[in-house]
């Protein structure tokens, strides 16, 4: 029997990462924030003083990437996120990282992956898919508060503008644009607490887990 796979997609700061971590912990599944794979490649390039359009170097770093040593605290800087969004437009890099992500879902007993193309490209046959949304003002406020909690300066208007640009780039890129899978459950977290979003997701996941266990 194949491991159970939960795919979670959505735009930046929609709450998908927090939800994915909580779901993975609850069901004792493995979790992968696929955005960190692109951030890791971007970070490696920036550390070497290279630009994000250096495809040869980006491909080399993607090939060397070890999913077991991704460090969220090191990779959560805003500038790395912006660079990662550009890295994600390089077809050869996406191909390499998607292959690594697909290997990850083979690990039992199951996994939760969050990103922007999980349900559509990485795991089209996932047992259940979610597409997480929230209005852009709520998302900007969340990102603003996240940055402040890290003790860094934050500019709400700049964050709002950056999110709009990020959405445009993610949704219109040629390779794996951000969009909901046709069979994904839409979950709007604009007015939901993390506990409410988690409860809503579990209501849909639980019957599938129980059905799998009964086989």
Swiss-Prot record:
Cellular compartments per GO CC: cytoplasm
Domain of life: Bacteria
Positions bound to ATP: 10-18
UniProt GO molecular function: ATP binding; CMP kinase activity; dCMP kinase activity
InterPro entries xrefs: Cytidylate_kin (IPR003136), Cytidylate_kinase_dom (IPR011994), P-loop_NTPase (IPR027417)
Subcellular localization, as worded in the UniProt entry: Cytoplasm
Pfam families: Cytidylate_kin
Protein's GO biological process: pyrimidine nucleotide metabolic process
EC number from the UniProt entry: 2.7.4.25
Gene3D superfamilies: P-loop containing nucleotide triphosphate hydrolases
Keywords: ATP-binding, Cytoplasm, Kinase, Nucleotide-binding, Transferase
Family the UniProt entry places it in: Belongs to the cytidylate kinase family. Type 1 subfamily.
Protein name per UniProt: Cytidylate kinase
Species: Bartonella bacilliformis (strain ATCC 35685 / KC583 / Herrer 020/F12,63)
Gene: cmk
């Amino acid at each position: 029997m194949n491991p159970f796979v939960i795919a979670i997609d959505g735009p930046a700061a929609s709450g998908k990462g927090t939800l994915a971590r909580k779901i993975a912990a609850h069901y004792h599944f493995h979790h992968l924030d696929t955005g960190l794979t692109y951030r890791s490649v971007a970070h490696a390039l920036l550390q070497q003083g290279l630009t994000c359009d250096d495809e040869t170097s980006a491909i080399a770093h993607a090939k060397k990437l070890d999913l077991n040593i991704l460090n969220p605290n090191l990779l959560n800087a805003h500038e790395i996120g912006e660079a990662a969004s550009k890295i994600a437009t390089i077809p050869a890099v996406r191909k390499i990282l998607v292959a690594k992500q697909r290997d990850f879902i083979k690990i039992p007993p199951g996994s939760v992956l969050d990103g922007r193309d999980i349900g559509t490209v990485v795991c089209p046959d996932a047992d259940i898919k979610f597409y997480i949304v929230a209005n852009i003002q709520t998302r900007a406020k969340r990102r603003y508060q996240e940055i402040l909690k890290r003790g860094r300066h934050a500019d709400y208007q700049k964050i709002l503008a950056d999110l709009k640009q990020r959405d445009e780039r993610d949704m219109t890129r040629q390779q794996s644009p951000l969009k909901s899978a046709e069979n994904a459950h839409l979950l709007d977290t604009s007015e939901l607490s993390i506990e409410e979003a988690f409860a809503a997701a579990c209501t849909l996941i639980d019957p599938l887990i129980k059905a799998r266990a009964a086989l």
